[in-house]
Amino acid sequence: MIKDMIASIEQFAQTQADFPVYDCLGERRTYGQLKRDSDSIAAFIDSLALLAKSPVLVFGAQTYDMLATFVALTKSGHAYIPVDVHSAPERILAIIEIAKPSLIIAIEEFPLTIEGISLVSLSEIESAKLAEMPYERTHSVKGDDNYYIIFTSGTTGQPKGVQISHDNLLSFTNWMIEDAAFDVPKQPQMLAQPPYSFDLSVMYWAPTLALGGTLFALPKELVADFKQLFTTIAQLPVGIWTSTPSFADMAMLSDDFCQAKMPALTHFYFDGEELTVSTARKLFERFPSAKIINAYGPTEATVALSAIEITREMVDNYTRLPIGYPKPDSPTYIIDEDGKELASGEQGEIIVTGPAVSKGYLNNPEKTAEAFFTFKGQPAYHTGDIGSLTEDNILLYGGRLDFQIKYAGYRIELEDVSQQLNQSPMVASAVAVPRYNKEHKVQNLLAYIVVKDGVKERFDRELELTKAIKASVKDHMMSYMMPSKFLYRDSLPLTPNGKIDIKTLINEVNNR
């Protein structure tokens, strides 16, 4: 068990100073370098005399200097707000307006001119590193101090800044490095794919730094070139893969993504969106010896609150895979619309309690009051997810409360429709979306479909293909759930975080 994230990193700087902490296509940085660089940057930040414990926005990609700056800010007592280089200017402005950071550190060129907030460039960070200033940690982030603040998309379009404290982070990290499901080895070799602005990134960097491992990052130019990206990934000596299931689906478009070509890859950690039976089955075919761990949890409960190793038996017997056993320190409950706790097997809203629950949204008391509360004497959070608990305390996922629609008199869960379509042996990926009329009522259901290789060639017309897909799922799909129109695509759009961009598809079919 670790008691201080920075102390853990500092220990490895003493015991394995020359061991790589970061590797970007062979360009390496060691634990000793991370200690020296973060000390120097922390001393530089202290010299700026910022307001104590004020948040600092850090703009960039998955580079070593981002990592060193994060560690430096933690040492100097400031929470960091990671903002990805691909963020839209409007979003960056909204984050700045809400967070009111005391400083902006631009590891990449900053796209905006902001009055009233000092900006530190990469050249200044490089100069600070060259100064090699010693640093004594007297006011580092600890306890309930904010460690990082990650902005998620709000339902109104306004981002919400989730405050994660040092204690929140320790609750998650200690569970992950000790839980048998994750089976994290010492000195883990982790793929660092999700951007730092997505809290799934914490699932790779926190256990890696806590156990003295190496992060294998990818340059941002490579991420845009999918063919080259997966050719490169196949050559990396990574042992643990952390991503959304959608990113793994994309990886499986490459024939090189298999156990024969990547024998070191033994663990897959999934979170951020639902892991489908179809994706898990394909992964077992590609990596017969691998462990597949399905984790679940909102950003507001520090990355994940439950996890389970997916077995072949689960893939054969479940239509929706279980999302795990809740963390021991985070009692998880199912409640009805009146807030009453439901019994095992009953479906309702998933709420999480315990020390991993955030203190709320930064500078947003109204939204905080809506989502955060106290349950059985512990801090609690409304996930907005539908689920149930089995008698064995396994959490089952039932979709999103806000992705439920009323259609033809039936209440339909969009993710359930997508799941059913994904059961077809002809479908590689499917998403159901509603089309609304002028009265904002659901007019009909549509489905975006990506078929498996070679399927289209078997049919002369799309109409015949649609009939065949419908026939392949009709035995386990209610007729009222069947989309009236299928739209075929070569791929589905992804958000910067690697999730299928359902909102873009909904806007597309509704001409928004």
From Swiss-Prot:
UniProtKB keywords: ATP-binding, Cytoplasm, Ligase, Nucleotide-binding
Pathway listed: Cell wall biogenesis; lipoteichoic acid biosynthesis
Cysteine pairings via disulfide bonds: none
Residues the entry annotates as binding D-alanine: 199, 303, 499
A GO CC term assigned to this protein in UniProt: cytoplasm
Short name of one Pfam family: AMP-binding_C
Main location: cytoplasm
GO biological process annotation, one example: lipoteichoic acid biosynthetic process
Residues annotated as binding ATP: 152-153, 294-299, 385, 397-400, 499
EC number: 6.2.1.54
Cellular compartments annotated: Cytoplasm
Domain of life: Bacteria
InterPro entries assigned: AA_adenyl_dom, AMP-bd_C, AMP-bd_C_sf, AMP-binding_CS, AMP-dep_synth/lig_dom, ANL_N_sf, DltA, DltA-like
Family: Belongs to the ATP-dependent AMP-binding enzyme family. DltA subfamily.
Function of the molecule: Catalyzes the first step in the D-alanylation of lipoteichoic acid (LTA), the activation of D-alanine and its transfer onto the D-alanyl carrier protein (Dcp) DltC. In an ATP-dependent two-step reaction, forms a high energy D-alanyl-AMP intermediate, followed by transfer of the D-alanyl residue as a thiol ester to the phosphopantheinyl prosthetic group of the Dcp. D-alanylation of LTA plays an important role in modulating the properties of the cell wall in Gram-positive bacteria, influencing the net charge of the cell wall.
Protein name: D-alanine--D-alanyl carrier protein ligase
Species: Streptococcus pyogenes serotype M49 (strain NZ131)
Lineage, opening ranks: Bacteria, Bacillati, Bacillota, Bacilli, Lactobacillales
